[in-house]
Structures are given as C-alpha cells and as structure tokens.
C-alpha cells in the first residue's frame, strides 16, 4: 500500500520526498516533512508551504483528507481506496503482500553446525532466523538459495570417532580407558557406541579404524541434524562438504599470493588481514603443512562469491564476531567486493523454566537440545520467541510463559484473534464471499485504522527484510491482535446494522495474521484447543 500511496502523491507533487508512518493513526496514516526541506529553497515558512501543497489534493479518490499540520503534510486514506485494496487481497489471498519477481539473488549459508552431535538451543536461533528470512525473501520475489556447510574434516570429526571408540572400550568391552581433555560425551555417544558395536563387531574397535568410525558417526549425526531442523519446519536446499574443497586449496593460496594477501614467516603461511582492517594477521597453513579451519573456510567462501549471487549472507554465532574482518580481508585479496558478503550474528539464548535455568540434556551432556524444547513447547512457540527480538541481541525467555493460555503468551494471544474471527463468521452463519460486496463506508475511525493496519503488512515485510530485522513481524502481529481484541470488545458485530462491513474488516485482519504467521513458519489456528 505504501508504494501505491507514494506514487499517487508523487504524481501531484512532482518531486521526491520521504513518506513516514506516524504512530498515531488518528492523526494520519502517512505524513511527509517535505515542506521543511523546501523552506530554504522557497524562502517561505514550512507551515505556508504545507498549506499550499495540501490544496493540490482536493477531491483525490485515495485520500479522505490531506491536511497541513505544523509544517507536516498529513494524509488519511479514504474508505473507498481501502475497500479497493481489501477486495484485491480477499479475491487473491494467496498473493496478498507478495512481491513481483526481482533480479536480485542471494545465497544464505546458515546453521552449519559441526556434525558431531544433535543441534542445541544456540543453533536453533540462527536456524529459525535463517529459515524465516528465506521464506520472507522468496515471498517478496527475491531469488534466494540456502546452504549448509558441513565441517566434515579436521580434528572435531576425529574426536567424534575417538569418543565413540573409548565409549565402546569402557562401557561394552569393560576396559580401562584414559579420556583426553576434550571429547564428546552424553547419552547420544553411548547410543552411537552400542549401534557401532552391533554393526562393526569387536575386532573393528582399534585406533586405526577411528577415521572410518568417525565417518560413519558423522553421517548418522547429519541425518539427526536434518531431523532436528525438520521438527522446527526448517528445510535447507543443499549441504556442501568441507572435504570437497580440499583440491581447491592450492589454487586459492596461489591467488592470494598473487594479490600479496599471504606471506611466509616462522614456517607458517599467514593471511595479511591486518592490511584490510583486521587487528592482526592470521595463520592459514601450519608448520606441518596442514591448513587451519580459516584456510578451508576461505576456499569455501571464494567458491560462494564466484557463483554469481548478488549477495552471500552468513548467519554465525556471536562468538564468531572476530572472524568477520579476516574473512572479509581474504575476499578483498581475492578480488571480491567484501560488501557482498554479509554476516548476521545470532546472540546467545538463556532458557528458563518457572524462573529457574532450564536443565541441560542428559542426551547431549552440557547442552539444551533444540529437540527437547520443541517437544515441550512446540515449533510454533519456539519460532515465535526466537524471532521476537533482534537476532544480535541476547535473548532470555521462560518457556512456562509459552504454555499459558492468556495474553502473556503472544502466540496464544495472536492465534486467539485469528480463531475469534472464524468464530464470529460461524456465529453470523456467513463466509467471506457473503461480505465481499460490503463497501466499508460505515466503519468508524477505529475500524478504519484497524483496516489500514491489516493492509499495511506489505510495508512491514519489506522493512523487515531490508533491515534484516525480522522482529518487526511479531511486533506487528502483537499490535494488530491487541487492536483487534480492543475493537471487538467495544463493537457489536453479529446482528449489528453494519455486520457485513465489520466481518469484511475482520477477514482482512485474519488474512494478515495468517500471512505473517506463515512467513514465520507458524500455523494460524481457526479454533483454540483447550
């Protein structure tokens, strides 16, 4: 709607201007401070200029009123125009708020957890954010592909195999074992040990077979990770292996060398990242010739940046903050524009239950499992809460609040609005088709404002995507639900003289809730279950 209004205003004003959304919808639906910008040029007061501009909008179909207030030009949208938009939305509900196909393309890499165990609650935040960003981008018409980078090489995979071997020796073969300082523990390791013993037999469990054992376990863990994601309605397009990039390492090093991006010192090869804003240079090849994790990651990012996407986006844990300058430096040395590599950081999550810290999972040792939380509160509540705050801010929540059936539980509160609307239609014995001819002229000011808010979802979605600020969607839904409940409690609907106008208004509110929830990966309920 905002873009339509902007274009209508531009036809009359014939110049560029900023169009704002005032918080107080009783004051205006849209406003522009254009008069303040023109004051210096025209050598007149903003108040006079705003009055002159307002006079150009007399009898315009889109606007109920255009007023000059303290130098601002305030626009109120007409019921006739809002009704036209309502008809379009209700006639094609599946296309509501959808964007036209765009040429801009994105590659999002996210989750990319080591395949050494099930996903924990820290992984879940980036996973939910990435999946919702994907749904939103595609809805708005962008080309958007997703990828999971599987760290299937290096020490952590060997450590997985070693941990299973030691578990077999200790728990099944009853041998005395000495555990290293770092190893994987938890019931899932014991379960893998039992399964491996049944599959491979006693003779297999020796140090020389650790790589084979690790490979087998890594594949099992990747299946489990995909199941964890699926449980939260998350599907990633493709999984790429770190090992598949081994052969490209030498060519990448040559390219970095040509661009003076690396140098040798102390028997190691260093990335000269301090030249590009990093706090110091970084080792990418060790003294024994083995590449560091950074080396493999540079090769992978070089491949991603070479695939022709307009922008490559990564979602990383906040503990990777210091990793950003070195990766951007490497891309600059390789001839890429590092602005086309965008990093979104997912901050830590603190989980409570009845005000106390949530218990760690026995299955995973020191972590809270994503699957445990989904089992307890459902994927809808999990997704909502992870999207309720900006991704790079710390999130603390008490899962007990998400099990309440009152306004303190936002998922329940918003769903209750959606279900209430279905209930009202049932009580009136009507369907949406029965109210399509209603012209909405009888709506009072609160009704018009509620209709405007429901139709303004597209603006919220665009803002949320462009700013990568997905919390704008749940914020919008909370406000919409609150305004609906207030309006419903203050206005008689079934049996009123303007029943059809009110039902048509409500159907728009329901459509906005359903559309926004769908983009968040949440199902809007038609009936509340107690």
PLM regions and their residue ranges:
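Short, charged, solvent-exposed linker or helix-capping segments at domain edges/interfaces
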Residues: 84-89
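Non-catalytic interaction-recognition regions
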Residues: 1-83, 94, 98-530
């Amino acid at each position: 709607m905002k873009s339509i209004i902007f274009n209508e205003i531009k036809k009359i004003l014939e110049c560029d201007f900023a169009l704002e959304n005032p918080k107080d919808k009783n004051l205006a639906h849209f406003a522009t401070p254009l008069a303040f910008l023109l004051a210096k040029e025209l050598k007149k007061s903003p108040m006079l200029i705003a009055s002159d501009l307002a006079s150009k909008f007399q009898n315009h179909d889109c606007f109920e009123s255009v007023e000059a207030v303290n130098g601002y030009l305030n626009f109120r949208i007409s019921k006739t125009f809002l009704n036209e938009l309502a008809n379009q939305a209700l006639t094609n509900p599946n296309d509501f708020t959808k964007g036209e196909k765009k040429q801009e393309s994105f590659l999002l890499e996210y989750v990319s957890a080591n395949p050494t165990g099930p996903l924990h609650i820290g992984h879940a935040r980036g996973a939910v954010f990435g999946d919702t960003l994907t749904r939103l981008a595609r809805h708005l018409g962008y080309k958007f592909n997703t990828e999971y980078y599987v760290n299937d090489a290096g020490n952590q995979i060997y450590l997985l195999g070693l941990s299973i071997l030691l578990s077999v020796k200790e728990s099944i073969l009853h041998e005395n074992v000495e555990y290293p300082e770092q190893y994987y523990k938890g019931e899932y390791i014991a379960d893998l040990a039992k399964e491996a013993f049944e599959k491979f037999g006693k003779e297999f469990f020796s140090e020389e077979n650790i790589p084979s054992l690790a490979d087998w376990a890594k594949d099992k863990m990747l299946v489990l990770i995909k199941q964890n994601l699926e449980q939260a309605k998350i599907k990633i397009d493709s999984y790429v292996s770190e090992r598949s990039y081994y052969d490209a390492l030498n060519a990448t090093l040559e390219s970095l060398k040509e661009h003076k991006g690396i140098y040798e010192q102390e028997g190691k090869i260093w990335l000269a990242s301090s030249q590009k804003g990093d706090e110091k240079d970084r080792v990418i090849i060790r003294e024994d010739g083995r590449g560091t994790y950074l080396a493999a990651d540079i090769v992978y990012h070089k491949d991603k940046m070479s695939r022709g996407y307009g922008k490559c986006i990564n979602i990383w844990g906040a503990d990777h903050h210091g990793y950003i300058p070195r990766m951007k430096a490497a891309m600059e040395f390789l001839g890429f524009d590092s602005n086309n590599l965008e990093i979104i950081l997912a901050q830590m999550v603190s989980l409570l239950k009845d005000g106390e810290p949530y218990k760690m999972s026995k299955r995973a040792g020191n972590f809270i499992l994503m699957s445990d939380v989904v089992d307890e509160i459902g994927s809808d509540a999990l997704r909502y809460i992870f999207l309720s705050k900006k991704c790079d801010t710390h999130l603390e929540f008490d899962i007990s609040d998400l099990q309440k059936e009152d306004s303190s539980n936002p998922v329940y509160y918003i769903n209750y609005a959606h279900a209430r609307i279905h209930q009202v239609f049932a009580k009136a014995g009507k369907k949406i088709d029965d109210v399509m001819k209603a012209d909405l002229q009888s709506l009072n000011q609160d009704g018009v404002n509620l209709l405007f808010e429901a139709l303004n979802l597209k603006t919220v979605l665009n803002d949320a995507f462009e700013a990568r600020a997905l919390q704008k969607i749940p914020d919008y839904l909370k406000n919409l639900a609150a305004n609906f409940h207030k309006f419903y409690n203050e206005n008689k609907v079934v049996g009123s003289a303007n029943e059809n106008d009110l039902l048509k208004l409500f159907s728009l509110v329901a459509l906005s809730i359903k559309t926004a929830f769908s983009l968040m990966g949440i199902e809007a309920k038609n009936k509340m279950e107690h």
